[in-house]
């Protein structure tokens, strides 16, 4: 029996320094609720954003993950294509991180883990956070959009699902990202 059928889905969540740390947190919460295994890697900018936007320490945030990797640990399991992972979500994905991914510049674990997802042609969802976009941002996104398995998913608000609170909007966006890596999330309202 293939290994993927005997273990829960394993998803890497990366958090970089763009605004939107709540997206990463909601992904972790939904993964836990779905019975999937989560691995977390956070950049220094992501840690600052978590503290500023959520009022949480990195340790408090990391409690929602099954495994936590230090972003400096370039030799971690998720840095190897032989380690079985079903997909990765970078939520949020800063333009700096996007540029590193687009150029194959794997200077830290988050960037290396994304590089592994691409070389193994696994699903990689990038929740890019910036507005407005510059021509350089768009060029980097266009470059990545052509890579098999990569999905660019700016966290755009949807209104067809009738969100009343910001938490509901964040949940919907996180659930959409999780669906893209094969994890069903409770209370995800699809268009019907």
Residue ranges of predicted features:
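A cross-family phosphate/adenosyl-ligand binding-site feature
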Residues: 1-125, 130-192
């Amino acid at each position: 029996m293939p290994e993927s059928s005997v273990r829960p889905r394993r998803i890497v969540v990366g958090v970089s320094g763009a605004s939107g740390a709540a997206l990463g947190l909601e992904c972790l919460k939904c993964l836990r609720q779905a019975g999937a295994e989560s691995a977390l890697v956070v950049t220094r900018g992501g840690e600052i954003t978590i503290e500023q936007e959520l009022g949480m320490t990195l340790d408090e945030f990391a409690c929602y993950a099954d495994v936590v990797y230090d972003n400096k640990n370039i030799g971690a399991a998720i840095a190897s294509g032989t380690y079985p992972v079903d997909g990765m979500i970078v939520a949020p994905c800063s333009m700096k991180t996007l540029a590193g991914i687009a150029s194959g510049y794997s200077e830290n674990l988050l960037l290396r883990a994304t590089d592994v997802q691409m070389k193994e042609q696994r699903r990689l969802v990038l929740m890019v956070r910036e507005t407005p976009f510059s021509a350089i941002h768009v060029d980097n996104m266009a470059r990545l959009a052509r890579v098999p398995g990569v999905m660019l998913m700016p966290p755009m608000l949807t209104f067809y699902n009738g969100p009343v609170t910001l938490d509901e909007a964040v949940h919907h966006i996180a659930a959409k990202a999780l669906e893209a890596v094969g994890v069903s999330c409770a209370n995800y309202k699809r268009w019907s």
